[in-house]
Amino acid sequence: MEFLKRHEGHMHMSDSATSMVTSATSAVMDMASATMSMTMSSSTSSSSGMAMEGMDHGSSHMAMNMWLTASFKDYPVVFKDLRASTKAQAFGIFVLLFFVAFLARMLEFVRNYLEEIVWKNNNYAEVEQGISQHSANLQSPPVKSCCDDNAKEVVSDESIDKQNSPQHEETTKARGTGKSLSLASTISRDIIRLALCIIPDLFAYSLMLAAMTYTLTYFFAVVIGSGVGRFVAERLMEHYRIKRGPPRNCC
């Protein structure tokens, strides 16, 4: 009887140990399954986020204009926030680009006006005169008459007319009354010259970016503004008898 009691006690202890092992194993399996589910959910959310980001990135690339179009709605121009949602806003951007293109052309006239009229820069006048004479000689060679005496008379008359011209008199007076500028005046003039070299290029490249939006409204604003500005600048140069400088490569 005592043996049976001991045997029953051993059986009870083994059953309790087995149940403890089983419960521990099930707990470990539950933790592993929970970890796997969390990992899968996080990977799924990250993949979905990447997919959405890729779709947004692709849609932004698809929205870029690759040819001339009349569509302008919510399309950025040069800056991120410079865009038009209505026709009135598009017209406002048109006026802005027209004014910038016009001003870029007029700055060339301002530079020539300051050098020749305001500052009376003799070196600038001589360089511009040499460029204009050289281009004139390349384009139209002198025509010789039948008689040498007549040709000499024509050349002498032209030289006399040039000497008696008001531009020649102003240049001669400026050379005779030329005074050395102070250091402050020289530095201030050089700063203005530097600004008149940088600002037109800044406007030109900004207008190029605006034209590269391939929007007809903004494209014609740049073209018309630049053309009108060039026309007005040339008319003012003729009015003030300012010599034209060499043509600029940029718009």
UniProtKB/Swiss-Prot annotation:
Major site of localization recorded for this protein: membrane
Disruption phenotype: Impairs growth on solid low-copper and low-iron medium and displays altered morphology in response to copper-depleted conditions.
Keywords carried by this UniProt record: Cell membrane, Copper, Copper transport, Ion transport, Membrane, Transmembrane, Transmembrane helix, Transport
Annotated Gene Ontology cellular component terms: plasma membrane
Function as written in the Swiss-Prot or TrEMBL entry: Required for high affinity copper (probably reduced Cu I) transport into the cell.
Protein name (record): Copper transport protein CTR1
GO annotation (BP), single: copper ion import
Transmembrane region(s): 90-110, 208-228
Native source species: Candida albicans (strain SC5314 / ATCC MYA-2876)
Keyword DNA repair among record annotations: no
GO molecular function: copper ion transmembrane transporter activity
Topology term for the membrane: Multi-pass membrane protein
Oligomer and partners: Oligomer.
Protein transport among keywords: no
Disordered: annotated span: 157-176
Bias (Basic and acidic residues) ranges: 157-173
Subcellular location: Cell membrane
Induction: Expressed in limited copper conditions. Expression is positively controlled by MAC1 and TYE7. Induced during biofilm formation and contact with macrophages as well as by alkaline pH via RIM101. Expression is down-regulated by 17-beta-estradiol.
Cited Pfam families: Ctr
